[in-house]
Structures are given as structure tokens and as C-alpha cells.
From Swiss-Prot:
The keyword Lipoprotein applies. Glycans are attached at N45, N73, N107, N118, N132, N172, N175, N185. This is Ly6/PLAUR domain-containing protein 8. Expressed in the large intestine. Preferentially expressed on the epithelial layer exposed to the lumen (at protein level).
Length: 237
């Protein structure tokens, strides 16, 4: 009897030590920064997930945060995925997601973008956005260095409503993230990416301007110079 009691107490203590607490918050517009962590359910007691999406676009998706407990194993102790898509100099969409193995995540706003580099003169991507739909018609936008073209369709939702975003532009997204999200209906940090396509701008060859008129003009200029030379020779004694 005593042995059974000791074993029971030990099991309770081990369970208490292994329990995980995460911030559990899903919000539009309001920040989850001041939310308090609470104990995770037994079926999602492996890691904490924290994701946020913010934009300066004229769409319903201005600020979205989703923090929850997960049964997922992180690829690292703390794995952060972050990228920004630029549509213009003033318009952008920023996404960051953390997977924190066995511990609470830090504020996702700490994962800031690296400083932007110079604009690459040969790198252009179609840039546009829509609140709904499956595509948008973009105008060319010059990318910063180390950016690539991105076309994504994302669905962000909570228990009450769902909002969609269609986006094309220049992004600093990594090739690993492109590969992971490529295809359809991939979920990262609670956000469903219905479509995520990347194109390396370095592989794009700029369209060459027609040279016909330039060549004709050059030949005409040479002909006039030769004719003028002959006339001058005939007039001189």
C-alpha cells in the first residue's frame, strides 16, 4: 500500500514538472503581449506556437496574432520563421512565427526584419494585393537586394471569423520557407497559406530594347558623313 502511494505521488510530481504553459490568444487588431500564460491541455503539451501578421496595406488584415499550445515538435529549441513582402515603398506585409519546444515563446515583435539593402536595378516583380479572391493584377516593382518574387494567398482566422489576403510582391523570404510552403494549403503558425509561390529574380532576364532604329540611325549618320566628305573634297582646290 505504501509503495502504491509513493508511486502515485511520484507520478503526480512528474506530471506537474512536465506540464507546459503557453500564452493562448487569438486576436484581430488587439495585441496579445499582455496575455498571461495558462496550462496546456494534455493533447497539446509539447511546444508553444506564437505567430503574428501585420501590414500597412488597405485591407482588413492590419494586425493578427495567434498563440497556442501544440503537439508539434519544433525543428530547433526555438525556431523562428519571418519574412516581409513589399508591394511599394510604403506598403508591406510582415509575417513571423515561432515554435518554442517545451517553453513559452517570446514576443514575436522581437523578430525584426534585417535592414533593407539597395534597390537592384534588374530585379522586378509584379506587385498587388486584394482582400479576397485567388489572384491580383500587379504592376512592376523594383526589388531590394536579396529579395525574390512571391505570390501568396493566406487565410487568417479565429473562432469567429476568417479573413483572406492575396498578395504579390518582392520578399526576403528564405528558400527553405518557400520550399516548405510551396504547393497549397500549408499551415504555419496557425495561418493557412492556400498558395505560396516563389521566383528567384536573379533568374529573370530583363527584356532587351529593340535596336533596329538605333542601327538604322547609325548607318544613316555614317552615310551623311561620307557624302559631306566627298562634297568638301570636290569644292576644295
Amino acid at each position: 500500500m505504501k509503495g502504491i502511494l509513493v508511486a502515485g505521488i511520484t507520478a503526480v510530481l512528474v506530471a506537474a514538472v512536465e506540464s507546459l504553459s503557453c500564452v493562448q490568444c487569438n486576436s484581430w487588431e488587439k495585441s496579445c503581449v499582455n496575455s498571461i500564460a495558462s496550462e496546456c491541455p494534455s493533447h497539446a503539451n509539447t511546444s508553444c506556437i506564437s505567430s503574428s501578421a501585420s501590414s500597412s496595406l488597405e485591407t482588413p488584415v492590419r494586425l493578427y496574432q495567434n498563440m497556442f499550445c501544440s503537439a508539434e515538435n519544433c525543428s530547433e529549441e526555438t525556431h523562428i520563421t519571418a519574412f516581409t513582402v513589399h508591394v511599394s515603398a510604403e506598403e508591406h506585409f510582415h509575417f513571423v512565427s515561432q515554435c518554442c519546444q517545451g517553453k513559452e515563446c517570446s514576443n514575436t515583435s522581437d523578430a525584426l526584419d534585417p535592414p533593407l539593402k539597395n534597390v537592384s536595378s534588374n530585379a522586378e516583380c509584379p506587385a498587388c494585393y486584394e482582400s479576397n479572391g485567388t489572384s491580383c493584377h500587379g504592376k512592376p516593382w523594383k526589388c531590394y537586394e536579396e529579395e525574390q518574387c512571391v505570390f501568396l494567398v493566406a487565410e487568417l482566422k479565429n473562432d469567429i471569423e476568417s479573413k483572406s489576403l492575396v498578395l504579390k510582391g518582392c520578399s526576403n523570404v528564405s528558400n527553405a520557407t518557400c520550399q516548405f510552403l510551396s504547393g497549397e494549403n500549408k499551415t504555419l503558425g496557425g495561418v493557412i497559406f492556400r498558395k505560396f509561390e516563389c521566383a528567384n529574380v536573379n533568374s529573370l532576364t530583363p527584356t532587351s530594347a529593340p535596336t533596329t532604329s538605333h542601327n538604322v540611325g547609325s548607318k544613316a549618320s555614317l552615310y551623311l558623313l561620307a557624302l559631306a566628305s566627298l562634297l568638301l573634297r570636290g569644292l576644295l582646290p
